[in-house]
Amino acid sequence: HLCDRRQRQMCIRDRYKNTFLFYLPRLCEHCLNPACVASCPSGSIYKREEDGIVLVDQNKCKGWRMCMSGCPYKKVYYNWTTGKAEKCIFCYPRVESGLPTVCAETCVGRIRYMGVMLYDADKIKDLASTLDEGDLYEAQRQIFLDPNDPDVEAAALEAGISHDWIEAAKASPIYKMISKWKIALPLHPEFRTLPMVWYVPPLSPIAQAVDVGKLSMKGFIPDVQSLRVPMQYLANLLAGGNVKPVVEALSRLLAERTILRKYSDNAGTSQFLTCEILPEQLQGIEEINELKALGLTVQDVCDMHRLLAIADYKERFVVPSANRNTEAAVLMQGSQGYNLGGGEDMRRRADSLFGGPMNRKIIPLFEEYQRAPDSTQGGK
């Protein structure tokens, strides 16, 4: 039996690269403890208090490029034309208007979600100081607050968080996947930057091996622990090497899919596809004890299927608009705007590394732009 198990593991491992495609969209994590902010000598990188987005102040950036080496995810880039650092801005103008990011909205697989998470900022230092890398996932999950808790809601209002943002946190799909169902995991938590972009681990090739009858069943749920090679691979990627949270997340996903597949045949395919199966129809199922062991209820199974399979636009993206009533944004209309590729405005403001005038040429974006006068030659 042990020999057969090892042969099965070797077979799945050898065929892993040929039978399983795992596309991992790696973008800026907009961390709670961003290393790029700490490594910038000029202090040009900052994390916004109102929404947690990490941005680069182009007027302060001096091109030291220490943020590039400081970011463990390598998501800060250097613009050789402007001499400035650039990174993902999380589409903050769209987020301020209550819209999702472009990458999330244009995802054809509809696998990206956006929402509000409330957290205790006073615990960040203790969390980042956790000794065991395997405990970092659970430690970061504990920093998130329950928006439905009256004490948390009162503290949020006292801290200046608007009522709209609190209501958005209650309806956040991110909170459900991270804190309620525990099916989302952070990317490389051992970096200790506390990333805020989390990932739901893939079911393949685990589920594929189950479908063809290569794995044993543990109750009604396939025994995912028999595949230690994929488990450890995903654990090193998403849980700091701790296999337990990965096994639990995949077990919950497999339980949801197994139950919905089994009982959708009785309810009809149309009801399964539109999630019209009511929790009352699943109350007497024989798998109720296994669900309790996984920390799930029948309502959780229906909600998971709704959110992960057929959720609409408003369910996947719960983004409240920013409250900027005190700013006169209308005064900026008609200006040049976000210009980092050259242009007359950029050439007149271009500085060298140490604050003096930059004498090198910057190719303009349009031919009709006139060349900026050279101050060293007394041009006007």
Identify what each model region corresponds to.
Residues 109-375:
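Long, compositionally biased charged/polar accessory segments in the mid-to-C-terminal portions
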Residues 13-21, 25:
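A structured beta-alpha segment of the ubiquitous adenosine-cofactor-binding alpha/beta core
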Residues 7, 22-43, 50-74, 83-106, ...:
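Cysteine-centered iron-sulfur cluster-binding motifs in ferredoxin-type domains/subunits
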Residues 1-12:
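Single conserved hydrophobic/aromatic residue that forms the stacking wall/gate
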Residues 377-380:
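Short acidic DE-rich linear segments
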Residues 44, 77, 118:
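Active-site-proximal loop/turn and secondary-structure-junction residues that shape catalytic pockets
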Residues 16, 49, 80-101, 111, ...:
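Basic, glycine-/proline-tolerant helical and adjacent loop/strand elements
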